[in-house]
Amino acid sequence: MSKPDVAQVKAFLLQLQDEICRSLEQADGVGRFVEDAWAREGGGGGRTRVMRHGDMIEQGGVNFSHVYGDAMPASATAHRPELAGRKFEAMGVSLVIHPHNPYVPTSHANVRFFIAEKEGEEPIWWFGGGFDLTPFYPFAEDVQHWHRVSRDLCQPFGEDIYPEFKSWCDRYFFLKHRNETRGVGGLFFDDLNRWPFADCFAFMQAVGRGYLDAYLPIIERRKAQPYGEREREFQLYRRGRYVEFNLVYDRGTLFGLQTGGRTESILMSMPPLARWEYDWQPEAGSPEALLYTDYLAPREWL
């Protein structure tokens, strides 16, 4: 395995955060990200950037963090005893965008790197990440575009990579208590160290950059589409599922909250408004019903 270059990964992640914020500000036209730089007591820190009340983006956050320490928390080494007694570094960019317009899907992306080192031993390292789309009023052409970008960026790394990481995404973003996917998926990967460091890093970069290629054209197509109170109410109802997933299943959220992470940055992914309604059912044959029948179960899009 080629030796990991931690500084190179960090430089890319900082640049990626800048690039994503710049592109989303452009797409919004009015809103600006406000930065909150923070430090972690045990070592490290980050840059949390949040946009609120933009023209297209109701609320969105793009977070960079880089934390390190002399030993992993017990909760992290319980199922990975080989990490015990090693100093560690973890860094990543994660983002969630909640648009105003119900015809523009919510999107999420994350790329991260982890390394644990011990004097006289080989470092243990891996990459993780992915991106996924959560439409409220889906258009097949948008979902196909999202998955086409996903497939194309995976192609140079092997024919089997897109099907593997697409399927992992479908399994991961699944609400068991609702028996539905969170959205229409995309890519998800973790523990990636199957190739030399340079190749794994190149894949993580492709995913990070691919997010904008996948999302920006959908924003442009849908952001001016007229909507009314009915669509807004449904958007808020479906956002409730986003909250349920993040608080019940999301590994990053749970790990962060359980290990004394920065709560404001961890909960940045929450929508600004959401609603619940007892035993709500969509009207048969309605656009809302179409989401349930055609989009909230894993399927092949290409």
Swiss-Prot record:
The active site is at H108 (proton donor). Pathway: Porphyrin-containing compound metabolism; protoporphyrin-IX biosynthesis; protoporphyrinogen-IX from coproporphyrinogen-III (O2 route): step 1/1. The record marks H177 as: Important for dimerization. Its EC number is 1.3.3.3. PROSITE patterns: COPROGEN_OXIDASE (PS01021). Its cofactor is a divalent metal cation. Transmembrane segments: none annotated. A divalent metal cation binds at H98, H108, H147, H177. The keyword Transport does not apply. It catalyses: coproporphyrinogen III + O2 + 2 H(+) = protoporphyrinogen IX + 2 CO2 + 2 H2O. This is Oxygen-dependent coproporphyrinogen-III oxidase. The lineage of its organism: Bacteria, Pseudomonadati, Pseudomonadota, Gammaproteobacteria, Aeromonadales.
